[in-house]
């Protein structure tokens, strides 16, 4: 027995003692391969999963490193069977390889003939395979490249795709490094992606994912299709590319609800690409409109299901996914792995914070007690109404008013899910509100006013969760969300993580109704951030009148 912070159990769960002096080092060491499941105050539970281990393998970690990490931090002896299982699971990645054969074209090759035999006999994979040309090789039709990778992953034999990519139509793109340069982690992310061919780069919000995309484009020097979440995001990508690269306005097209421009660099929204008319996708032609050399997926954790199907046909093109979290609430992380590619780079948020590239954050959960009348209404409500009732309690509005007053003059975002609640808060705070029906032009006007300090408080619905660059937001107050969405929590914290001019820290408040579904969902949402090393302090709404001190005891204002 040693004094390690980790207990490794035979059911593949890892228990991390949060208050242990080496907990931070342990968390950083296990993050590349373990998945956080629960994060209460004192002991966090992680799990080893095949997908987590394969992602780690693809990102350059081997079984020996994983085993050494578990042995180094474990308090008790690690079950031998678990160590063997880790080694065997990681060895499954790459046992099958998709390669380009000069004579036969696309071929599935196996380093282990018995594995190939198993795959050939499987009812799921056999129809996707062609003629066996050698004891260790079988033909694959290029159109089945994506589907085959999905099926092989489900069979437990994730294929390493070494078949290469078409170069696409050449188009000169250079970074315009005029008074700025890529940060070291951005350069490393681009190199890892390029060497791997395709895959996902995971970086915190505010850490410059767009620049990683721009640098990848400069490396590819080819026509590029960029898929983004919404029109505002598309225009921000366009502005950033004009500022950071040699591209001109004529070379960048927007393919959205408003415009249908196809140019050497085309930025399209997920919504338009997945629009269906009479059972067909009329905008599918966009993927064949040019000989794209690179396809970029922004916020890859939000990729709609139809785009997975479209991406299965794009396996011969380089694909780069950008995201702050690989967590998908629909559980389709395996499809991201198979079709976009494995994780190529993942920077822990706290590491980038330590380098000064994102602001430190103080996360506070403010718990309110429902008044008797609301409590009774909640107790007697139908299950599907309960979350809305406790999320929109009037007690929350009073807490938000106090918090905004305490941070008067500081750029503050109030974020929520329910429009009537946000309209009420906007009226109470005398602040503008941005919601789904707000026009793109009006959104941009309000975002610009917020950036320039003309507005200090802005009330926003979930439309502001993604890709909205609000560099000056210093305080975020969350009143309601998409049930227990961890990805949403990460995005919302990201709104305030961009580095502050005064090197100060950001405040992230979550206002939660005590002893309700709201509290349960809040605990679930916080799991991802706990994995990144963010601790939530819990304060009572009755105790905030004099202000909520930060972790060092300093009051706001």
Swiss-Prot record:
Q: Which domain of life is it from?
A: Bacteria
Q: Name the coenzymes or cofactors required.
A: Mn(2+); Mg(2+); Ca(2+)
GO function terms (MF aspect): ATP binding; DNA binding; helicase activity; hydrolase activity
Positions with a binding annotation for ATP: 203-210
Keywords for the protein's UniProt record, in alphabetical order: ATP-binding, DNA-binding, Helicase, Hydrolase, Isomerase, Magnesium, Manganese, Nucleotide-binding
Q: Give the CDD domains listed for this entry.
A: SF2_C_XPB (cd18789)
Outline the segment boundaries, as ranges, of region: Required for protein stability or solubility: 1-135
Identify the species of origin.
Kineococcus radiotolerans (strain ATCC BAA-149 / DSM 14245 / SRS30216)
Coiled coil stretches, renumbered: none
Quote the entry's note on domains: Removal of the N-terminus decreases solubility and/or structural integrity of the protein.
Q: Which Pfam families match?
A: ERCC3_RAD25_C, Helicase_C_3, ResIII
Q: Helicase C-terminal domain spans which residues?
A: 398-544
Q: What's this protein's name?
A: DNA 3'-5' helicase XPB
Give the EC number(s) under which this enzyme is classified.
Answer: 5.6.2.4
At the top of the EC hierarchy, this enzyme's class is: isomerase
Q: Which residues belong to any copy of the Helicase ATP-binding domain? A: 190-344
Catalyses: Couples ATP hydrolysis with the unwinding of duplex DNA by translocating in the 3'-5' direction; ATP + H2O = ADP + phosphate + H(+)
Q: How does it assemble?
A: Monomer.
What lineage is this protein's organism placed in? Bacteria, Bacillati, Actinomycetota, Actinomycetes, Kineosporiales
């Amino acid at each position: 027995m040693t004094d390690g912070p980790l207990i490794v159990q035979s059911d593949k769960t890892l228990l991390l003692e949060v208050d242990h002096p080496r907990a931070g080092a342990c968390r950083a060491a296990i993050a590349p391969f373990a998945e956080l499941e629960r994060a209460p105050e004192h002991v966090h539970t992680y799990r080893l999963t095949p997908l987590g281990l394969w992602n780690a393998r693809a990102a350059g970690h081997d079984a020996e490193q994983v085993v050494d990490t578990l042995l180094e931090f474990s308090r008790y002896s690690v079950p031998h069977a678990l160590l063997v299982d880790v080694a065997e699971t990681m060895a499954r990645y790459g046992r099958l390889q998709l390669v380009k054969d000069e004579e036969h074209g696309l071929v599935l090759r196996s380093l282990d003939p018995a594995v190939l035999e198993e795959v050939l006999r499987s009812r799921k994979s056999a129809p996707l395979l062609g003629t066996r040309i050698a004891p260790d090789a079988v033909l694959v039709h290029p159109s089945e490249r994506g589907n085959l990778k999905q099926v092989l992953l489900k069979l437990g034999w994730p294929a390493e795709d070494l078949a290469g990519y078409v170069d696409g139509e050449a188009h000169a793109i250079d970074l315009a490094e005029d008074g700025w340069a890529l940060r070291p982690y951005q350069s490393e992310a681009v190199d890892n992606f390029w060497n791997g061919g395709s895959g996902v780069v995971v970086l915190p919000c505010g850490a410059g994912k767009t620049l990683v995309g721009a640098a990848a484009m400069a490396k590819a020097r080819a026509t590029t299709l960029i898929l983004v979440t919404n029109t505002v995001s598309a225009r921000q990508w366009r502005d950033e590319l004009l500022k950071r690269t040699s591209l001109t306005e004529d070379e960048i097209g927007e393919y959205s609800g408003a415009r249908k421009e196809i140019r050497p660099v085309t930025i399209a929204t997920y919504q338009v690409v997945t629009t269906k008319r009479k059972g067909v996708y009329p905008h599918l032609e966009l993927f064949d409109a040019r000989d794209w050399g690179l396809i970029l997926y922004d916020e890859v954790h939000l990729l709609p299901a139809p785009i997975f199907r479209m991406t299965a046909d794009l396996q011969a093109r380089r694909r780069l996914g950008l995201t702050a979290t690989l967590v998908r609430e629909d559980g389709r992380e395996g499809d991201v792995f198979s079709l976009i590619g494995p994780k190529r780079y993942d920077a822990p948020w706290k590491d980038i914070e330590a380098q000064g590239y994102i602001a430190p954050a103080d996360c506070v959960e403010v718990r309110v007690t429902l008044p008797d009348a609301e409590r009774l209404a909640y107790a007697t409500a139908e299950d599907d109404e309960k979350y809305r009732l406790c999320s929109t309690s009037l007690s929350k509005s009073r807490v938000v008013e106090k918090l905004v007053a305490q941070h008067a003059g500081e750029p503050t975002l109030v974020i929520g899910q329910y429009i009537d609640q946000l309209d009420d808060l906007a009226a109470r705070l005398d602040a503008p509100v941005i919601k789904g029906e707000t026009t793109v032009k009006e959104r941009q006007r309000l975002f610009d006013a917020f950036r320039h300090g003309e507005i200090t408080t802005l009330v926003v619905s979930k439309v502001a969760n993604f890709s909205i660059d609000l560099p000056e937001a210093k305080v975020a107050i969350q009143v309601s969300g998409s049930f227990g969405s961890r990805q949403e929590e990460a995005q919302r914290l990201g709104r305030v993580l961009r580095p502050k001019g005064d090197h100060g820290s950001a405040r992230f408040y979550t206002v939660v109704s005590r002893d309700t579904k709201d509290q349960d969902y809040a605990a679930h949402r916080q799991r991802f951030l706990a994995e990144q090393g963010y601790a939530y302090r819990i304060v009572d709404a009755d105790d905030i009148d004099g202000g909520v001190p930060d972790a060092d005891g300093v009051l706001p204002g």
